[in-house]
């Protein structure tokens, strides 16, 4: 059992303030909001953590991982899960990962684009979620294309449905549940980014980081992460070692 001091550093308000990002369809990272309720892998993990710590869970809902990053960096949020990259590591401290994501592009119905390499061309308009690891990787790997950032997966999905853009950047697992909503759209094979979805806490809270890491590792070992992925519809997903 963690010490009272460790718990206080992780949750100084007496509540576990857990940050989650929502989208129109679930992924290994995004939760979905329906009828005033949020569901998803990250929600299941945070609920379990709060139960183990014997404290209430205060879920904080955001449109994208960039917003969650800023909330954690300011200390407004105690714990979250998000894709790792060097830019984020300047703002939050990362613990272990529970899932490895790979980002690619979706192209709308009728598109002539067949590969990720073909996206990196002048005149190609890429739509990505603002302040995310995927948007930063798209800028780095497709310097010849034009990158337009939008605030939410919901807006990206709506633009893809209308064909308002040439390539839409997200992780493969996000497209598993989004693709059925976009008739004629295709997901390009391969990836332009791979990273882990890891637990994160505010910087300079070493006891909080250690405790968060222990909770996640226990969730992986106990099968909780696997069950949460299964419940979200990702029965073939592999838990990160």
Where are these regions (language model features)?
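Short loop->beta-strand "edge-of-pocket" segments that line small-molecule binding or catalytic clefts
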Residues: 14-22, 38-39, 117-134, 146
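A ligand-binding cleft/hinge motif common to bilobed small-molecule-binding domains
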Residues: 66, 82-91, 137, 161-193
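Ligand-binding cleft/hinge of the Venus flytrap
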Residues: 28-35, 46-56, 134-152, 179-180, ...
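Periplasmic-binding protein-like
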Residues: 99-110, 172, 176-217, 235-241
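Extended ligand-binding regions for polar small-molecule ligands
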Residues: 1-7, 37-52, 117, 131-132, ...
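Short helix-initiation/N-cap motifs at beta->coil->alpha
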Residues: 58-70, 113-114, 148-162, 195
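Flexible hinge/capping segments at coil-to-helix
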Residues: 98, 107-125
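Extracytoplasmic small-molecule ligand-binding "clamshell" domains
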Residues: 1-83, 222, 231
